[in-house]
Amino acid sequence: MVSVKKIVASALVGVLMFSAVGCNMVEKTQAAIDKTTVATVNGEKITLGEVDSHLKGVFTQMKSQYGDKYMDDPQVAQQILQQRQGILNSLVEEKILVVEANKENIVPSEEELNKKIEQQIKLYKEQYGEEGYKKAVESMGYNEDTFKEYLKNQFIADAAASNASKDIKVTDEEAQKYYDENKKQFEVQAKGVLARHLLFENEEEAQKAYDEIQSGKTTFNDLFTKYENNKLEKKTPIAESFVVPDENAQVAKEFVEGLKSLKEGEISKPIKTQFGYHIIQAGATYEKGAQLPFNEVKSQIIQILKQQKDSQKLKSDMDQWKKDLNVKVYDDKLQEGLKISK
């Protein structure tokens, strides 16, 4: 028979433990905090540890600025809470899009994904250098393999997002209406030259296009028209036009130098920048305050309106997918380990 003293002792321990937890006197270990479920998507859990792994760089900065007890500072805790919320929202939406991509059978092939991943990593290394790239990857909580997996999921999610808006179009009438109602937006901010350019991923494609223009097989304008919607569809090559200011141009140095060597109407040989290979055509010179004509900004306007429509469509679809996949988000759990002022 169990003694009465043992029963009473057990009961008291239970009451005291309940009270302590209720008053936050018993603090969770970091391991327990990391295992806290902050969302579920289609039955798959997202833990707080997964969220925080994306904030390693932020935590390092906070620790350097505020010391080891930075999470005890209510203002810092509030900032971290906001960061966690943003990361969680991104993770939830990424998982939803990956599910939808698989459901719609639009996941790119392994070969295509690997090619995209290698190209993206190569671009990062060219922009930030080998050491800068490694530090950036580590600050986001990844190693080389997990970063590649992250990029893979991003490309799969992009496929689902693009598929959701594939039938959305912007008419010339809508573009003209936007131009007429927002003319101030298309005033030149500083004197400069209008640059129209074709951007290719590699030198071979750029050289082939240049040779075809020079031989008369095609024209720069024909290629510009052919490629000007590619940016919207996340395809290459792309075609863009914009005014490059005479001074303090926030454009790649090689691009500016290539443009300055051209007279109006002339076309450059392929020029390499960190973004790829450009064939540039020099346009007219515009004074500050001049109005850019509709035909020179039409593709920009279509891009603006398409992005607006895409965003609205994706938001609507996302709301429905969250219901279909029984998505649960526990925002209150994001406060774990933080001292949030009431």
From Swiss-Prot:
Its EC number is 5.2.1.8. GO terms for biological process: protein folding. One of its GO terms (cellular component) is plasma membrane. A lipid is attached at C23 (S-diacylglycerol cysteine). It is a lipid-anchor. Coiled coil: none annotated. It is an enzyme of class 5 (isomerase). InterPro entries: Foldase_PrsA, PPIase_dom_sf, PPIase_PpiC, PrsA_foldase, Trigger_fact/SurA_dom_sf. It holds the Pfam family SurA_N_3. It catalyses: [protein]-peptidylproline (omega=180) = [protein]-peptidylproline (omega=0). Keywords: Cell membrane, Isomerase, Lipoprotein, Membrane, Palmitate, Rotamase, Signal. A lipid is attached at C23 (N-palmitoyl cysteine). It comes from the Bacteria. Residues 190-284 form the PpiC domain. Residues 1-22 form the signal peptide. Belongs to the PrsA family. Plays a major role in protein secretion by helping the post-translocational extracellular folding of several secreted proteins. This is Foldase protein PrsA. It comes from Clostridium perfringens (strain SM101 / Type A).
